[in-house]
Design a protein with these regions (language model features):
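A short, flexible loop at the N-terminus of ABC-type nucleotide-binding domains that lies
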Residues: 1-5, 9-21, 70-71
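Helix-to-loop junction immediately C-terminal to a conserved catalytic motif
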Residues: 50
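Conserved ABC transporter NBD signature motif
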Residues: 58-69, 73-74
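Conserved ABC ATPase "signature" region
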Residues: 98, 102, 109-127
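Conserved ABC ATPase signature
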Residues: 131-135
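Conserved catalytic motifs of ABC-family nucleotide-binding domains
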Residues: 152
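Catalytic Walker B motif of ABC-type/P-loop ATPase nucleotide-binding domains
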Residues: 156-159
């Protein structure tokens, strides 16, 4: 399944242009790293993809069909993990996953099986019943990603998922994401401003001041930079 962004632009005002004529195509079963400094337009792009704001111009297509923002169905094919935590720290990991599954309309039996599957995949058995507020940063990130996958999305979009993690947990997170691509068959867009995380992706998109400055395989970037 293909997810295409075509000539996307977004202006917050006449003087503030967050994204300028951005186009790319994402394929499932791949991890695409989106790299850019703070202010490059990455977070604005994620808000548009999540349906939180509308682009000023341009289109988003899924399998060649333009995404009508009045149709909520495409959002059901995407899982989002935002930079700022949105998980309930007072409730247990199990309760958070259960609530997310209920919002997605999963029946009790399917939800129970899915939670067990995700707990095993993310190795969360030792802490899944504890209040989220008592967990480490790495444990919370695993839980947030698991929650985004509760409904088996085709796409997983991650906005700065390694924020606040040390190098060991960053490496573990990268391993988990690649495992998910193989086991779940989903496509991943990994947004980051940390160059060390570039190798987490199969492909690379680079943004600067709202514009795309590179889109391709890492080997191509090395040739351009050499």
């Amino acid at each position: 399944m293909k997810f295409a962004v075509k000539n996307l632009s977004h202006n917050y005002s006449k003087k503030v242009r967050a994204i300028r004529n951005f186009s790319t195509e994402l394929n499932s079963h791949k991890v695409t790293a989106l790299l850019g400094p703070n202010g490059a337009g990455k977070s604005t792009l994620f808000k548009i993809l999540a349906g939180l704001i509308r682009q000023t111009s341009g289109s988003i297509e899924i399998n060649g069909t333009s995404w009508d923002r009045n149709d909520p169905e495409p959002l059901g094919k995407i899982g989002f993990v935002f930079q700022d935590p949105t998980i309930d720290g007072m409730r247990s990991g199990t309760a958070n996953l259960t609530y997310a599954g209920q919002l997605q309309g999963l029946d009790n039996n399917s939800l129970k099986n899915r939670i067990e599957e995700l707990v095993a995949t993310f190795d969360m058995g030792d802490y899944i019943t504890r209040p989220v507020g008592s967990l480490s940063g790495g444990q919370r990130r695993r839980l947030e990603i698991a929650r985004a996958l509760i409904h088996r999305p085709i796409w997983l979009f991650l906005d700065e998922p390694s924020t606040g993690l040390d190098i060991d947990n960053r490496l573990k997170l990268s391993e988990i994401i690649h495992l998910l691509v193989n086991s779940e068959g989903c496509g991943v867009l990994w947004c980051t401003h940390i160059p060390d995380e570039l190798r987490s992706g199969d492909n690379l998109i680079m943004m600067k001041e709202g514009e795309k400055i590179f889109d391709g395989h890492f080997d191509s970037l090395e040739q351009v930079m050499s």
